[in-house]
Amino acid sequence: MCYTVKRVTIDNILKYRAMNKSLELNPNKVVAFLGKPAKEFTKADIINYITSNNIRMVNFMYPAGDGRLKTLNFVINDAAYLDAILTCGERVDGSSLFPFIEAGSSDLYVVPRFATAFHDPFAELPTLSLLCSFFNKDGEPLASSPRYTLLKACEAFREVTGMEFEAMGELEYYVIAPDTGMFPATDQKGYHESAPYAKFNEFRTECMAYIAQAGGRIKYGHSEVGNFTLDELVYEQNEIEFLPVNALDAADQLMIAKWIIRNLGYKYGYEVTFAPKITAGKAGSGLHIHMRIVKDGKNMMLENGVLSPIARKAIAGMMELAPSITAFGNTNPTSYFRLVPHQEAPTNVCWGDRNRSVLVRVPLGWAAKSNMCRIANPLEPDEHYDTSEKQTVEMRSPDGSADVYQLIAGLAVACRYGFELDNALEIAERTYVNVNIHKHENADKLKSLAQLPDSCEASADALEAQREIFERRGVFSSAMIDGILKSLRSYGDRTLRADIDGKPEEMMKLVHRYFNCG
């Protein structure tokens, strides 16, 4: 009898080992059970997980026009019903989800994306949750869906540049609870504070664990600058920062993270807010977005150890479209009380290296030639570690009011636009600064720089002037842009900053109104 022996190459063995290594510490219960990356999940895998783990409920979750996740619950009646909902999705009323959809023809389909499956950490009954995509009556992706807009933006970026657009967010939020009076933190000095001066480290780490179990790729978490007491309440700012992933996943994990942080806050009786401003004179919460451009798995942001022409072109696009990007990233009047000098937020259109007074920052990128690990740990061998993948650029204007899909789509359009400009490198050179622009001695430099909008209405003006760029290649639909313009102009806030200057009571009314934004 003859036997045919299948030859297994060394490359296949190494690939298999690498995949297993990436899965062995994965906190997502579905990934761990199925033994495969989430992006490879099939309907059969989801059914297998449900039947093998006594899952009683399935939740469909999807972002609506207010930027928050909505939920549709399903009892698993039988195997046929489970197969039907996973295959066909379900109908929803689009007019109740999006302001641009008319009630007369509002039915939409929501269909689950299997790669997003996660075990709901808050449900009393064992529940599997999945994020969904929207489809219209003809079974086509909903053109004005925020996530589909981001998908189109990424495809357009790829078509123009031949490269991939990746992103990650820095999610800032405040936790508010009664002040015990013990170990008070220093006002506005909460950055990386430890317990017992930081009161909500355990809350943050529990949030991080749940986000990771839901598929979020987290870099780290820490307490932030904002830390103060007011009316016997302690206000503590925290941040959870993610790792760069493809832009669609970056937006998905931010949505899930906000949902988890709010639910855990509700469980413990804490107030949690992502609002851009919560009181006068204190640091507001931003939603900084880091970006990198990748080709064939290689980060293209560096060339010979310095920022590459590719990165500079992307920055140039953001410099040109920065005023209109506020329409996606700064969506209510309190956003523009954050974008003021000396409040950890940008005010002018410029960029620089390791500079927190600029709009787009190029963070420290491990370009040092020394082996810092060996210097700190003399017993370690002298080995090379490729740190080039770490380099990103950071847009610092957005805040927690943003629709994360629209925001990252807008940034993808802006970066693509940089490759369509003949003078992109000249723009990047002209807008570069290497000083703190808010210091008195740099006043002349500050005057030479364009300013960001100072109100929702001014942001709408900027978007209207540049809307054609966002609508190119069918990325942003005209209906979506019209809806954003209408929303921004509805606030009538063109002179609001001046009108309530020195009126803390009026400021607090605004804060209360937009406390739960995003």
Question: What name fits each language-model region?
Answer:
Residues 8-228, 245-259, 270, 406-407, ...:
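ATP/Mg2+-dependent ligation/transfer catalytic cores
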Residues 338-341, 430-438, 481-492:
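Amphipathic alpha-helical surface "interface" segments used
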Residues 16-19, 179-180, 230-235, 380, ...:
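Short hydrophobic/aromatic-rich motifs at helix boundaries and adjacent loops
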Residues 174-186, 219-243, 277-297:
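Active-site-proximal loop/short-helix segments
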